[in-house]
């Protein structure tokens, strides 16, 4: 079969970045992941999406997303659904508005057309709803009539689409639609944040490789819209990127970038899409479970951290990064080519706003260090030794996080920028320890369809995964049951239940580990408003906390 069959036709004819199948010339690099470096391929959560739901709607939306992603892999938490404190009035979008964010799933065609059609039927059931069908004007028409349909979960959330893969791997692709005039600037912007160049690049489309292993690719792409189309930012979704050397990155960004917590910064791209930057804590040491109490006692008598200003980088500067980076000074070698001179000029001319953080006990996040962290500190997507049950147990019991160790994230409202007190923190990060990894009982997959699909088309690929670019055991991540045998008649090795809606505040009088069943206080509409929040007249103001 011609690899472009169903691929959207000529290069400039198709607006949809996902119209090209996984086997087209746009994404042929999905079969050449060995060319990626370890740093580029080792973090599957380099890009994630926060979905912001109205009160009471987070759980069904989270389950709907998990059920769809289970067709790619049942333990791939790339999306976190959180709730607002109160519903908001929706502004009617302009006619023909194009949401700026989309998620495209490429499924293997060789396992049968019925599998793709079955998932397509799932996307036609609530809470999913049909959004639009893309019109293809190229020389080749898609052989599956559903391959140009787009769906959505709720207003202001990303579009979703299903595409067949003629050859290569299954793919999860995040797509940002750009204004025609802003495409080149957006390309440079995301190239700077992702610290890499696109693997495929055309006049109106490019692909950044995010993560790759034996069966799955995670990609980030940009699509240039025609002049007469304008992307609308998804006001109920926020893209989040893990970044390194935040102090070096901030002066290079085109729009203001402000800290909303100790580890997160907020900015916008050229089209007004909100972006969260999560700073990686390189070489962060986590106390052992037996020493948590001792560490907390030590911290009670320690002096608070002084206010730290973003360093003004000048040639020869050796100041340490604000996030305790082990490097003696700014590392410009990691920047994409062409940004070194821009960094030197803008760092000297841009004022550096001071920032400081207070410590609280309301937030815990997954460690975000580099490959030199201890193997028990990060999920392992490359090493796959041992029995599946042993790997799952090892992840649950070995990946314990100390809330006391991660004290100190005074958060601010993502949309308003208003600073919140510790009692107002009501949403756990997309990188928090999911409850399914803390539970010792495994439950079946959300649907029997997903279980049978996994067993039908994954059994032939079981076994240890090869390391990428000779990853050593010390640099590998803590065991995550990535490829485990699933069967429609067995639920012993199925995915654990999805986490509850992230609308709780951790309350504790002494430090506890997240998996040690901390006390949880549910927060509803009676939660006190954050300090300095808007009055009753500002009901449209976003109330989502990261």
From Swiss-Prot:
It comes from Homo sapiens. It holds the Pfam family FAM124. InterPro entries: FAM124, FAM124_dom. This is Protein FAM124A. It comes from the Eukaryota. Residues 1-37, 286-360, 488-546 are annotated as: Disordered. Residues 24-36, 488-511 have a biased composition (Low complexity). Belongs to the FAM124 family. The gene is FAM124A. Residues 304-324, 347-360 have a biased composition (Polar residues). Residues 286-302 have a biased composition (Basic residues).
